[in-house]
């Protein structure tokens, strides 16, 4: 099965769907919002062509469920807030927003939410229906999505750490896994494996920057957030917990060792230095803001499905309940690609073991996602300088 067919979140609205298990990402969006507002402010002040008529925006790797429209809401509110503060003709410009993800993404779950979303925008922001136009643009963001110099602002949250393919060179000349017992580029991976993953990320991210710089108008902005490398004090990350669970299944004879050794996640968590270096070497963008932040991976537990704060009793419950929350979120993201390789039947047992590992990590006070946020401005063409 092609990677693009399985690289998506759990769709629908069931118990293991991304729509029901993405409150952690809502907290990440909250962290990003001040930088988003500043990015929008600088964009509107840049007075790009046609920006007073229609601001063209895209969310790359938008996923599905309510978080997709939370991102849209934050972008629209930021544009309206800046327009009101600046008291200019951009107070309520038309906004055209393209939602991008791979073809297997559950766009329908987003479309079902649009009528109520438009009504809410009209009630809370005074935006007439038709002044914010939302549509889908399916396809890989490692390829061309929009005409040249047609976009004002590109946004992506928790997507660019996904690679376009599993790196080559992960199998030795003897046909043996070079990353035996490991499912991604971890600290325990051999140097050649780490280099293979770094090379693939460098190639993909360079392509991403080049292609989307061509789609942006000169002076256009791009805001990216992705998972990045942590430090020793963070303890095991969730992929390490998954890796342990898979290895346990192999040791107990419930899963073939070959299945483990032939599985490599198409995911890379870069360091801040790597991202900075790639942007500078590609050369199309100026870095306006670059920072990292960390959030415990049970932090979103304090937010319920309607993004309301839970009771103190719920927030301060034991680590097993919080581990279940972490497991549902992780499952919503990773189950499609795991099930395509290991089979649907083993998923309940696998995630049960994952939950046990997560509870232990939380009990020890470990468990953080490290994130990187970078704000970019497209450099003017030499002829424009």
UniProtKB/Swiss-Prot annotation:
Pathway stated in the Swiss-Prot or TrEMBL entry: Alkaloid biosynthesis
Binding site for Mg(2+): 179, 261, 263-264
Ligand binding (S-adenosyl-L-homocysteine): 18, 62, 67, 101-102, 140-141, 157
Cofactor note: Binds 1 Mg(2+) ion per subunit.
Transmembrane segments: none
Keyword field: Magnesium, Metal-binding, Methyltransferase, Transferase
Residues holding caffeine: 158, 161-162, 238, 369
Function, in words: May be involved in the biosynthesis of caffeine.
Protein name (Swiss-Prot/TrEMBL): Probable caffeine synthase MTL2
Organism of origin: Coffea canephora (Robusta coffee)
Gene assigned in the entry: MTL2
